[in-house]
Amino acid sequence: MSRNNEELQGISLLGNQKTQYPTGYAPEILEAFDNKHPDNDYFVKFVCPEFTSLCPMTGQPDFATIVIRYIPHIKMVESKSLKLYLFSFRNHGDFHEDCVNIIMKDLIALMDPKYIEVFGEFTPRGGIAVHPFANYGKAGTEFEALARKRLFEHDAQ
């Protein structure tokens, strides 16, 4: 069953040939659409191998692969808006751990998912690789326990 125009309202970036790339951190660029299967529990996974941010101390670029996994509830993130949102970090100065937590919190605010996790595999700098992991499970649901379990086992992946 195809989506109708009413279901696609609010999606303005996908298919737009005049894409404007943000020059600074832009959470407002994120767009969501309705999940047609809110009663099914399933994972959506995004692998974003070209993430870039700036070191807040030196201004030097940091590169990472960001992996986002979530179990949607009512809303889902539209992928082109996610791409542009992640691009908006290109001139944003923050530590790796901050970037991962900011991404997770912005996606929670947008979608209110049942569960979400964000993993950053940053390129080593000074001989040290930083791989922050942040997750969230909706309070009072089975996903709260899943978040705790995944947090303690995330390095076993």
UniProtKB/Swiss-Prot annotation:
Chief subcellular location: cytoplasm
A Pfam family that the UniProt record links to this protein: QueF
GO MF annotation, one: preQ1 synthase activity
Enzyme class: oxidoreductase
This protein's UniProt keywords: Cytoplasm, NADP, Oxidoreductase, Queuosine biosynthesis
Cell compartment(s), UniProt: Cytoplasm
Pathway: tRNA modification; tRNA-queuosine biosynthesis
Family of the protein in this entry: Belongs to the GTP cyclohydrolase I family. QueF type 1 subfamily.
Protein name listed in UniProt: NADPH-dependent 7-cyano-7-deazaguanine reductase
